[in-house]
């Protein structure tokens, strides 16, 4: 054993040396245990010549007591010279002498999930005196809490109410990890089953594992478990029960397999306590007569299986050199919690430079799939492959394969013998009540003082979701570096195992109810990569494994993929690392933009890639059973308000609402007065109005002669009020990307990264307070945080002073301005695209398409090619119900003969202040650039608008816009000319540039 391994032995030596045998714990059983093992400690003698110590054992041989030193079995966990540590049960539990063993077997092809036929029945079993009880376990509630344990538990036999001469099935579950409380025969071949809740609780009924004998082959039996508590289950999504036949195992070497027909998970009648329960029913035909069969929720993995596995490692001369097995602590029932230290032994100081990796499993005893993943990990890391050797040379692995052996032994689903969920008590100071998690946390704390811990992972099972995924932790600081780095390892795992691991199902939020879980506690202790790996009880929905169940080999393979991903994560060649980092940046950019524009009231700092779902089938379930012997919780009395206080509160609320209504009307009136003298600088022209668009704002950008032509009558002074009428009650930001390129070049915009090197992305800011012809240009590098850009896009107006009236706003008016968003400032009119048009002198077909919600909004633009060099990004303030960006779609074509046909899409009707589902409409804008002969003249020609708006001034001077027409049929966009020849003649042979902008929700 290396020097480093000696110093890092975090075993619970304070209690491991005084509990070697059963007689040390309970003196009432000393005589029975002495008769069996014929051992006695020197401390048991009253002779003063014998030293009072527990380290000397007296063995009775040939009529005399022979002293010898106690073997350090507790120190090393398992010993090659002696048997395994005996399994201890609560004293009242009945245990059969028969040892249950199963063979390892993997089906030749993946087992498909069950597809409902629609003919499944829902049996309901009212209480009937004619029903026969065929199995009844001993009452588990003789004591309100755990008292003490002993080897073998209570060996009093339980008589069956039937014999072998009857055709009634015989049930048994009094073995390790077995769970079955009661069985009632309701028909000749139909049985109603009740599973036992976790000991010392009245809930957590999910795990079942029982034996069936005395069956007849070819008979259709129905089994119905009637006391599940979860409304949602994977059985509703095609999961099948597991079945094991001893005759099939001996004859054909077939192990656990998925079986069952007529599978149905449904809500049944309420129980006696008024709670609603859920039933699982299935039918099955046994393959053999008089066979011994088993049914289970998932592949069983018992405490004895773990001890046998660890004993094999300890007896292996090769693996035992780099895998040291110790006892971390003892549980409430005095069962051992093992810890493994896996690393290549080194006697020099280089071993301290190694980083540590921590893995734990089976904190929830019913999640047996976590033990199979742990087994796969240990098989690989202890193997002789070059990658395994590299991992052992690089890291120090601390592994706790079973955190809750007590719960595993008695067949609990979630809790320990304390009646509590251990994965909610990592912050608890009750070492005696939750020893395994207390010592695990202490071990990690001491380990972090000596070396860096790069990863912690707690293995779990999930009862409501398919696939395998992870839960991580996000910081409140929202640092982009840490924010993305915490997602790199799960992303690598999904790439190494694409048919089992789902990155999209991974969640990274830290909720208050999860603060006691292992991953959150370890993350707060300083472990950046702190995860919970969730493995489904069912199967996969990905790749080649889609629609099939996971086998034990599938679960074990996740241990290999975990090691493979760990090598990729720590590879000195950072190619894969940065590739995943770049992919995560793209995911964040797209998903965050979608969430920003879905609800612009949400601050950017609060927008994340995910919202962790409630995982009551995983590490996030609540266990709030109170134990008086653990902690006495004093109930807090709720102090009710007096009638006078309640009336005062109601009156204050009414006054606040009245003041709010008054302030709103007052602000709206002042807003109308302050904008009454706003002058429209756009010129009037006889047949169509031309908007001097961006002329004053961008004189130095080659857009001095950029005009927007809209069909219809002359621009009336009421246009400003009409445009204002289209604004909603929220402030949003519209992003208009104007691409200035050299003519004659074709730039592929589809899939182009706006943050890449092929574009120069800038932001333009205008000085507040006076009109100026210069603009301040700020160039942002692509690696800057995306959140900074998003915050700058949706920031509110920084000036609360009216530009025309010179009136200063009060604090209350500013607050109301922010809350209600009803003020339209002059800056909006400087950048606002005119969207209200007249239908005068238009064809009937054009009018129909004008008011068609599916018609595209087209813009024709002329630019000066002399200044077309850079890409500029302009941000204009817009007040619409939803905030959506313009997304580039298609290619930029410098050929006037190539017309891009518009795709049917939703219109700009979402700009109207409508409520309900109409807020999520889509729209798109086509910008068509025509090059003219004159170098300094350019025009924006706009086709018919895709919708019509009618603004009305209502009572209290509130503005409301109504959509005039909403047709659902699909139309193509109006062309600006009747045919291509006319367009070519109109442009005098000059090339045309098409820009297509699409706004999506």
Swiss-Prot record:
Cofactor(s), by name: Zn(2+)
Reactions mediated catalytically: (L-glutamyl)(n+1)-gamma-L-glutamyl-L-glutamyl-[protein] + H2O = (L-glutamyl)(n)-gamma-L-glutamyl-L-glutamyl-[protein] + L-glutamate
GO molecular function, one term: zinc ion binding
Keywords for this protein: Carboxypeptidase, Cytoplasm, Hydrolase, Metal-binding, Metalloprotease, Protease, Zinc
Pfam family, one: Peptidase_M14
Enzyme nomenclature, EC number: 3.4.17.-
Cofactor: binding details: Binds 1 zinc ion per subunit.
Ranges where the Peptidase M14 domain occurs: 299-570
GO BP terms: protein side chain deglutamylation; proteolysis
Polar residues composition-biased segments: 648-657, 962-971
Disulfide bond positions: none
Active site: 534
Catalytic EC class: hydrolase
Protein location: Cytoplasm, Cytosol
Residues annotated for Zn(2+) binding in this entry: 364, 367, 460
GO cellular component: centriole; cytoplasm; cytosol; microtubule cytoskeleton
Region of interest (Disordered), residue spans: 641-661, 962-1001
PROSITE patterns, A to Z: PEPTIDASE_M14
UniProt xrefs under PANTHER family: CYTOSOLIC CARBOXYPEPTIDASE, CYTOSOLIC CARBOXYPEPTIDASE 3
Task performed by this protein: Metallocarboxypeptidase that mediates deglutamylation of tubulin and non-tubulin target proteins. Catalyzes the removal of polyglutamate side chains present on the gamma-carboxyl group of glutamate residues within the C-terminal tail of tubulin protein. Specifically cleaves tubulin long-side-chains, while it is not able to remove the branching point glutamate. Also catalyzes the removal of polyglutamate residues from the carboxy-terminus of non-tubulin proteins such as MYLK. May catalyze the hydrolysis of aspartate from the carboxy-terminus of target proteins.
Similarity remark: Belongs to the peptidase M14 family.
Protein name: Cytosolic carboxypeptidase 3
Lineage of origin: Eukaryota, Metazoa, Chordata, Craniata, Vertebrata
């Amino acid at each position: 054993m290396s020097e480093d391994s000696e110093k890092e032995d975090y075993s619970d030596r304070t209690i491991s040396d005084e509990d070697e045998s059963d007689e040390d714990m309970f003196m009432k059983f000393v005589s029975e245990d002495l008769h069996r093992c014929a051992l006695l400690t020197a401390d048991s003698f009253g002779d003063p010549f014998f030293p009072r110590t527990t380290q000397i054992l007296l063995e009775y041989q040939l009529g005399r007591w022979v002293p010898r030193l106690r073997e350090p079995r507790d120190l090393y966990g398992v010993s090659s010279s002696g048997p395994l540590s005996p399994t201890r049960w609560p004293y009242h539990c009945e245990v059969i002498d028969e040892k249950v063993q199963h063979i390892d077997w993997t089906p030749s092809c993946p087992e498909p999930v069950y597809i409902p036929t629609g003919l499944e029945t829902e049996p309901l079993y009212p209480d009937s005196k004619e029903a026969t009880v065929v199995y009844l376990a001993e009452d588990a509630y003789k004591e309100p809490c755990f008292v003490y344990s002993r080897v073998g538990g209570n060996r009093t036999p339980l008589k069956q109410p039937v014999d072998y001469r009857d055709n009634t099935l015989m049930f048994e579950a009094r073995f390790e990890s077995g769970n079955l409380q009661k069985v009632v025969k309701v028909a000749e071949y139909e049985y109603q089953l009740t599973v036992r809740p976790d000991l010392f609780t009245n809930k957590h009924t999910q795990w079942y594992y029982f034996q069936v004998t005395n069956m007849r082959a070819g008979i259709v039996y129905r089994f119905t478990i009637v006391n599940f508590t979860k409304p949602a289950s994977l059985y509703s999504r095609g999961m099948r029960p597991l079945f094991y036949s001893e005759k099939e195992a001996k004859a054909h070497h077939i192990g656990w397999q998925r079986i069952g027909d007529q599978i149905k998970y449904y809500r049944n009648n309420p129980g006696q306590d008024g709670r609603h329960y859920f039933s699982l029913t299935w039918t099955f035909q046994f393959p053999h007569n008089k066979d011994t069969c088993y049914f289970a929720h998932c592949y069983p993995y018992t405490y004895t299986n773990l001890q046998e596995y660890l004993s094999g490692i300890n007896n292996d001369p090769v693996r035992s050199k780099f895998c040291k097995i110790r006892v971390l602590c003892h549980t409430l029932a005095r069962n051992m919690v093992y810890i493994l230290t896996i690393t290549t032994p080194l006697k020099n100081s280089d071993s301290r430079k190694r980083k540590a990796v921590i893995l734990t499993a089976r904190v929830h005893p019913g999640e047996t799939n976590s033990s199979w993943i742990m087994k796969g990990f240990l098989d690989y890391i202890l193997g002789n492959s070059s990658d395994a050797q590299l991992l052992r040379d690089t890291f120090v692995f601390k592994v706790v394969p079973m955190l809750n052996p007590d719960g595993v032994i008695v067949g609990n689903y979630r809790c320990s013998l304390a009646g509590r969920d251990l994965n909610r008590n990592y912050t608890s100071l009750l070492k005696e009540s939750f020893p395994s998690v207390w010592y695990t946390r202490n071990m990690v704390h001491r380990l972090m003082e000596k070396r860096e811990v790069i990863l912690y992972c707690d293995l779990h099972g999930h009862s409501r979701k398919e696939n395998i995924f992870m839960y991580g932790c996000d910081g409140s600081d929202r640092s982009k570096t840490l924010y993305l780095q915490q997602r790199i390892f799960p992303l690598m795992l999904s790439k190494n195992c694409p048919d089992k691991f789902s990155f999209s199902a991974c969640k990274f939020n830290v909720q208050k109810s999860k603060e006691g879980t292992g991953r959150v506690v370890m993350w707060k202790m300083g472990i950046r990569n702190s995860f919970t790996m969730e493995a489904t009880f069912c199967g996969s929905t990905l790749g080649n494994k889609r629609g099939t169940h996971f086998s034990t080999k599938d679960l074990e393979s996740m241990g290999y993929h975990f090691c493979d991903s760990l090598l990729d994560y720590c590879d000195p060649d950072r190619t894969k690392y940065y590739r995943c980092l770049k992919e995560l940046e793209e995911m964040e950019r797209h998903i965050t933009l979608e969430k920003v524009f879905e609800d612009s009231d949400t601050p950017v700092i609060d927008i994340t890639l995910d919202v962790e779902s409630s995982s009551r089938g995983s590490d996030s379930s609540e266990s709030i059973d109170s134990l008086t012997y653990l902690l006495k919780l004093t109930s807090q009395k709720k102090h009710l308000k007096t009638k006078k206080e309640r009336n005062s509160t109601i009156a204050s609320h009414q006054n606040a609402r009245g003041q709010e209504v008054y302030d709103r009307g007052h602000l709206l009136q002042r807003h109308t007065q302050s904008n009454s003298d706003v002058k429209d600088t756009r010129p009037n022209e006889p047949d169509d109005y031309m908007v001097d668009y961006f002329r004053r704002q961008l004189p130095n950008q080659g857009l001095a002669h950029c005009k927007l032509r809209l069909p219809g009558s002359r621009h009336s002074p009421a246009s400003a009020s009409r445009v204002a009428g289209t604004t909603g009650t929220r402030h949003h930001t519209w992003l208009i990307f104007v691409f200035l390129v050299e003519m004659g070049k074709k730039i592929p915009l589809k899939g182009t990264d706006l943050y890449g090197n092929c574009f120069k992305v800038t932001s333009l800011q205008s000085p507040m307070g006076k009109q100026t012809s210069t603009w301040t240009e700020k160039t942002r590098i692509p690696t800057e945080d995306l959140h900074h850009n998003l915050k700058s896009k949706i920031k509110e107006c920084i000036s609360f002073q009216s530009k025309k009236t010179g009136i200063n706003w009060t604090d209350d008016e500013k607050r109301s301005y922010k809350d209600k968003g009803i003020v339209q400032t002059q800056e909006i009119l400087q950048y606002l695209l005119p969207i209200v048009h007249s239908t005068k002198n238009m064809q009937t077909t054009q009018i129909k398409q004008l008011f068609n919600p599916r018609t595209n909004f087209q813009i024709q633009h002329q630019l000066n090619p002399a200044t077309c060099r850079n890409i500029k990004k302009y941000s204009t303030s817009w007040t619409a119900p939803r905030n959506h960006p313009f997304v580039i779609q298609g290619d930029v074509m410098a050929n006037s003969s190539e017309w891009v046909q518009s795709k049917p899409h939703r219109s700009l009707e979402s700009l109207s202040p409508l409520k309900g589902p109409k807020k999520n409409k889509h729209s798109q804008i086509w910008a068509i650039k025509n090059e003219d002969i004159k170098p300094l003249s350019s025009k924006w020609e706009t086709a018919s608008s895709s919708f019509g708006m009618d603004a009305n001034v209502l009572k209290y001077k509130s503005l409301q816009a109504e959509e005039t027409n909403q047709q659902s049929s699909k139309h193509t966009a109006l062309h600006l000319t009747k045919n291509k020849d006319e367009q070519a003649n109109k442009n005098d042979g000059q090339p045309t540039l098409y820009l297509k902008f699409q706004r999506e929700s």
